[in-house]
Design a protein with these regions (language model features):
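Helix N-cap / loop-to-helix initiation motif
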Residues: 43, 96-100
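N-terminal helix-turn-helix DNA-binding core of bacterial DNA-binding proteins
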Residues: 8-42
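Basic, amphipathic "hinge/linker" alpha-helix immediately C-terminal to the N-terminal HTH DNA-binding motif
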Residues: 66-85
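A generic alpha-helix surface/boundary motif
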Residues: 85-87, 103-104
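Residues within the alpha-helical elements of helix-turn-helix
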Residues: 39, 77, 94
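Short, Lys/Arg-enriched N-terminal segment that forms or immediately precedes the first helix
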Residues: 1-9
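Canonical helix-turn-helix DNA-binding module
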Residues: 33-64, 68, 72
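C-terminal regulatory/oligomerization modules of transcriptional regulators
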Residues: 107-145
Length: 145
């Protein structure tokens, strides 16, 4: 089920951090400030400030020099963000969009798309998966542009 876009009180930056942290935990087993900074291409000082803020908001637990872990609320939110990201990525791949364009478009859309639109895309992806011929027809129209 698609997740909600970032509410007014939560910045897209917080969502980017959560997504990065969960990805690191899933791939490396842990997330450190240095790894988050490298993944997001920002300074460690900026990451430390945001991590402390997210700790205060109850999204993660941070201990200086020891790393961090997501709280249940933080992990749930991060998983929803990743599912939203994956749904959009899968949809654009079905349409034959290049990986570079997909990355750019998904990063631009994922925090701002409404739950209603996500549900519609999810339904469309399901229908397209059941009708590969339709995907071929769509690709023939989009690759000519």
């Amino acid at each position: 089920m698609p997740s909600k876009p970032a509410p007014a009180g939560r910045s897209t930056a917080v969502e980017d951090y959560l997504e990065q942290i969960l990805d690191l935990i899933n791939t490396k087993g842990y997330a450190r400030v240095a790894d988050i900074a490298q993944g997001l291409k920002i300074s460690q000082a900026s990451v430390t400030n945001m991590v402390q803020r997210m700790d205060a908001e109850g999204l993660l637990k941070y201990e200086k020099y020891r790393g961090l872990v997501l709280t249940t609320a933080g992990e749930t939110l991060a998983r929803n963000i990743m599912q939203r990201h994956q749904l959009l990525t899968d949809f654009f791949r079905m349409l034959g969009i290049s990986e570079e364009v997909i990355y750019h478009d998904v990063e631009g859309m994922e925090h701002h798309i409404s739950p209603q639109t996500l549900r519609a895309i999810e339904a469309l992806v399901s229908e397209l998966q059941q009708n590969p011929r339709l995907i071929t027809n769509i690709k023939s129209h989009t690759h000519g542009s």
